[in-house]
Amino acid sequence: YGTAGPDLIACAPGTQALIQALPRVLGARRVAVLGPTYAEHAAAWRASGAEVAEVADLPPPDRSLVLVNPNNPDGRAVDPGRLTAWARDAAEADHWLIVDEAFADVRPDISLVPVLPLANVIVLRSFGKFHGLAGLRLGFALAAPRMVRRLEADMGPWAVSGPAQDIGARALADQAWAAAERARLAVHMARLRDLLTGAGLGIVGGTDLFVLADHAEALTLYEHLVGAGILVRRFRANSKWLRFGLPGPEDQWHRLDKALSAFAGTTPIPDRRHG
């Protein structure tokens, strides 16, 4: 991930393990979560007894802050310069900045890793999302050496399996593959957005790994897609939202196109061979 050295990285059996570990390791009592976002962050802090506030923008640096960058589900991105300035102000009161960069492999330009180490900043990275190997259970916390040692002590020995270490090391070293994969994902995401807008959905945001769309009849569309064997994500925060991931083989693209066209009463889009 471009860190200055291995003493800035703690390995874990998935980012979720780190999300649950941070409240007990840091002990912060007042935490803001930039939302709406991945619900497990707020849940972990609330379970620790912390006072948690969901905020729509960067709050004053009078408490610790957790955000996902780029955000899940809407792809919102916060400039790393703003985050660095916030962290420096918050450091004066011993507050933490935790940035979950689970989807930053497709947005390396917004990563906070290049400014590390900062004493009060922790960056989380997820191996499985970009590499398509969620079941491998491999995640990382990037932070100042002292915090890395605390997290490693909390994780305990043998936190990461041998296969995860071997596969992760090989995959992360293959930067040529990563560059090609970013280009491939961008092409396929353009195709997916075409399908969705052609079926009358609005695009709220997203990344090249997922897209958040809205529709006045989102629940009806959700049930229609389930009937076609297609599962998308619904959200309590907004009943009009649906999050779509990228289809895989061409038959999955065809099935999605057919289902969307049937719902919208349109003709399926001819195969454009987006790559």
Each language-model region and where it sits:
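Conserved beta-loop-alpha segment that forms the PLP phosphate-binding cup at the N-terminus of a helix
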Residues: A4-R29
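Structural motif
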Residues: A32, S64-V68, I98, F140-L142
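Conserved PLP-anchoring active-site segment centered on the Schiff-base-forming lysine
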Residues: R24-A44, E51-V55
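Conserved PLP-binding catalytic core of the aspartate aminotransferase-like
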Residues: A186, D194-A228, L246, E250
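PLP-dependent enzyme catalytic core of the Aspartate aminotransferase-like
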Residues: G81, G227-A228, A237-G275
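PLP-dependent aminotransferase class I/II
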Residues: A10-P13, A17, N120-I203
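Active-site pre-lysine segment of PLP-dependent enzymes
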Residues: R46, P59-P61, P73-L133
